UniProtKB/Swiss-Prot annotation:
This is Succinyl-diaminopimelate desuccinylase. Its EC number is 3.5.1.18. GO terms for biological process: diaminopimelate biosynthetic process; L-arginine biosynthetic process; lysine biosynthetic process via diaminopimelate. One of its GO terms (molecular function) is succinyl-diaminopimelate desuccinylase activity. InterPro entries: ArgE/DapE_CS, Bact_exopeptidase_dim_dom, DapE_proteobac, Peptidase_M20, Peptidase_M20_dimer, Peptidase_M20A. It comes from Serratia proteamaculans (strain 568). Catalyzes the hydrolysis of N-succinyl-L,L-diaminopimelic acid (SDAP), forming succinate and LL-2,6-diaminopimelate (DAP), an intermediate involved in the bacterial biosynthesis of lysine and meso-diaminopimelic acid, an essential component of bacterial cell walls. The active site is at D68, E133.
């Protein structure tokens, strides 16, 4: 007997939905949701497909996720073609198996089972799905959230299916995420001959003391929910490629992952004060990818913990570590946001895979969360 979760996951993996393309994944999900009474509103923006679907009314629990996947890398290094889902030794292989087509399949099947058992459920069950999460994330969830907020849509709880687990399904639940802000810094000098440094102004030499000070700063000490804010230099570029030319400009890109103890405004202020103090001739551009958010213990966290304890017989850790997710946009609606998904050990890697049994377990957890919040 085939498992409906695995079957749907395989159908989704077969579609090579490299971000921001969907390749028919959402149509497959929409067909299943409409069959059980969901109203579906396609919400395309630019080159991105999104949809918002709901069933029932009242207190709202939304399941959020993305149909797009990252590139496969060298397909010759895969044991099987990345878009030909394969089950081997109990593992489901394929690009997106863990991030996050397995979660999408678990969500849809959970909704089917929930509606069959609770055809007249009290609250509203919803889905917010995008094909633009892995790449720019500019025309996906952020745009849908803007549209929903503009018409005063209510969203009480949101379960994001990102692969949160580390060793066993549910061992880690993300109840928040750090903020992320990136600086693109250009330090301007004067190009010249290395034999005549007095006729030039080397921006690399100028910048080094400032950068040394920058990387040594303790931005904050974090708190009980967040680790300390971290800063990492990601890219440095300077020079013409010749060994006898002093560069005229230096580019440095650095990123902050910041806790609720810092703000993007205070980070900008401290960085720019440091650059001014070192008397650098510079220009700087900032890109804020997301603010930090935290969902404290409450109805959603309690429901998720209950579901994990019921099916996995373990108490999950509540963490805010890792990268950003679309939860940062949904949190702006005032919703409680929690991430629960498969084990993340192989995400974005060659031979991405997930235990088939884990997806079955995850679907049962999702169903139990629905039963606790909107039945």
């Amino acid at each position: 007997m085939t498992c409906p979760v695995i079957e749907l996951a395989q159908q989704l993996i077969k579609r090579p939905s490299l971000s921001p393309h969907d390749e028919g994944c959402q149509a497959l999900m929409i067909e299943r949701l409409e069959a059980i009474g969901f109203t579906v509103e396609p919400m395309p923006f630019g080159d991105t497909l999104n949809f918002w679907a709901w069933r029932g009314e009242g207190q709202t629990l939304a399941f959020a996720g993305h149909t797009d996947v990252v590139p496969t890398g060298d397909e010759k290094r895969w044991d099987n073609p990345p878009f030909e889902p394969t089950i081997r030794d109990g593992m489901l292989y394929g690009r997106g198996a863990a991030d996050m087509k397995g979660s999408l399949a678990a969500m849809v099947v959970a909704a089917e089972r929930f509606v069959a058992a609770n055809p007249h459920h009290q609250g509203r069950l919803a889905f917010l799905i995008t094909s633009d999460e892995e790449a720019s994330a500019t025309h996906g969830t952020v745009k849908v959230v803007e549209a929903l907020m503009a018409r005063n849509e209510r969203l009480d709880y949101c379960l994001v299916g990102e692969p949160s687990s580390t060793e066993r399904v549910g061992d880690v639940v993300k109840n928040g995420r750090r903020g992320s802000i990136t600086a693109n810094l250009h330090i301007h000098g004067i190009q010249g001959h290395v034999a005549y440094p007095h006729l030039a102004d080397n921006p690399v030499h100028r910048a080094m003391p400032a950068l040394n000070e920058l990387v040594a700063i303790e931005w904050d000490r974090g708190n009980e929910f967040f680790p300390p804010t971290s800063m990492q230099i990601a890219n440095v570029q300077a020079g013409t490629g010749s060994n006898n030319v002093i560069p005229g400009e230096m580019f440095v890109q650095f990123n902050f992952r910041f806790s609720t103890e810092s703000t993007d405004a205070t980070i900008k202020q401290r960085v720019e004060e440091l650059l001014e103090r070192h008397q650098l001739n510079y220009s700087i551009e900032w890109r804020l990818s997301g603010q930090p958010f935290l969902t404290a213990r409450g109805a959603l966290v309690d429901a998720v913990v209950n579901a994990v304890e019921h099916y996995s017989e373990l108490t999950p850790q509540l963490l805010t570590t890792g990268g950003t997710s679309d939860g940062r946009f949904i949190a702006q609606m005032g919703a409680q946001v929690v991430e629960l998904g498969p084990v993340n050990a192989t995400i974005h890697k060659v031979n991405e895979c997930v235990h088939a049994a884990d997806l079955q377990l995850l679907s049962r957890m999702y169903q139990r969360i629905m039963e606790q919040l909107v039945a």
